[in-house]
Design a protein with these regions (language model features):
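Short, solvent-exposed loop/turn and secondary-structure capping segments
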Residues: 7-11, 93-95, 127-128
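A catalytic-pocket lid/entrance helix-loop region that shapes and gates access to the active site
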Residues: 1-42
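Serine-hydrolase catalytic core
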Residues: 30, 35-124, 164, 172
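Glycine-rich loops and low-complexity Gly/Arg-rich segments
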Residues: 19-24, 106-109, 139-143
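Short, low-complexity, polar/charged sequence segments that are solvent-exposed and flexible
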Residues: 14-17, 99-103, 134-137
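Poly-acidic low-complexity segments
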Residues: 2-7, 68, 72, 92, ...
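Catalytic active-site module of serine/aspartate enzymes centered on a nucleophile-bearing elbow/loop
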Residues: 125, 129-177
Length: 177
């Protein structure tokens, strides 16, 4: 903990590195301690255990994403499975999936792309079997940390079942090649 918060952004540094070198990144709109306060406010406002999507939106407003900060998905070899839900309150996962799809339309690539964007599913868009393995006594508990998961439990479960069906189909096809 730092000043009562459990999470804060790095100070002018990337959160991710590759081969020991920091990767380009989108700077957060807020610094510590405002970052933690904004997350708490957003979580409370939406009745979610944790939420930060508005912080990411604000970050992109203050610092439009630059080419060097984008993931070069066109360099990925093999099958790329992109999954997101519109009701993700941690970040705009559906927007990012669409952004990657658009990027692949304009850049030559060899990867096979399977993209799935669901209306409901929350941040935890995992295959249903994986959720049952992680939480055998109540897989639905995972999505209920978010207001959308509590409001749309049936739809979230249907999303997880569909993800399982699609990922299984893709893996079986890949194994048969």
């Amino acid at each position: 903990k730092r000043d009562g918060v459990t999470e804060w952004p790095g100070e002018g540094e990337s959160s991710v590195s590759y081969h020991g070198k920091p990767l380009p990144y989108l700077p957060y709109a807020y610094r510590h301690p405002e970052y933690g306060r904004k997350m708490q406010e957003e979580s409370k406002e939406g009745k979610d255990i944790v939420a930060s999507v508005n912080m990411f939106r604000e970050s992109e407003k203050k610092h439009p994403v630059q080419e060097e900060e984008l993931i070069k998905v066109e360099n990925i070899k093999g099958t790329l499975i992109l999954v997101a839900a519109e009701d993700d309150v941690l970040w705009e996962a559906a927007k990012y999936v669409r952004r990657m799809e658009e990027r692949l339309k304009i850049h030559p690539h060899e990867c096979k792309v399977e993209a799935f964007v669901y209306k409901h599913g929350t941040h935890f868009v995992f295959p249903e079997g994986m959720v049952k393995t992680m939480l055998p006594i109540g897989g639905d508990l995972m999505t209920r940390v978010f207001a959308a998961g509590r409001k749309y439990p049936r739809e979230c479960k249907e999303t997880r079942i569909d993800i399982e069906r699609n990922v299984t189909r893709i893996i079986k096809k890949w194994m048969a090649e």
